[in-house]
């Protein structure tokens, strides 16, 4: 059996350290709008000198360690989102639907366009999924796993 476990990257992603992940009770809604996002353009559009809201990774790691999903969700920040959401308003629209359906927090993943929301109730995530499916095809409700993700097949 092969597993991908909860690892946190540091530096430019080359340093990995194990951290405890979300509890198995956390429901995650993932929505990938049918958009192309150029990672290169997003990074070129990022003004490092004028980033107003940066993630406090040490604090977020402490939230994970303590299992405080509410505090984690309300403090999630993605600095790249300011750039991508200016190019594609759908990012904020998707987050709004998730938050209106009681997501504890929602944000874009990486340079986008995928958006995820953390929920403590599956019925809320399913309600948001139903709304999002009216406009987007790739919408998924999943649960976190304490053991990691099982990968069927071999790593190459």
Tell where the protein language model's regions lie, with residue ranges.
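Conserved glycine-rich beta-strand-loop-beta hairpin in the small C-terminal domain of fold type I
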Residues: 113-115
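ATP-dependent small-molecule kinase catalytic core of the GHMP/sugar-kinase superfamily
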Residues: 1-105, 118-156
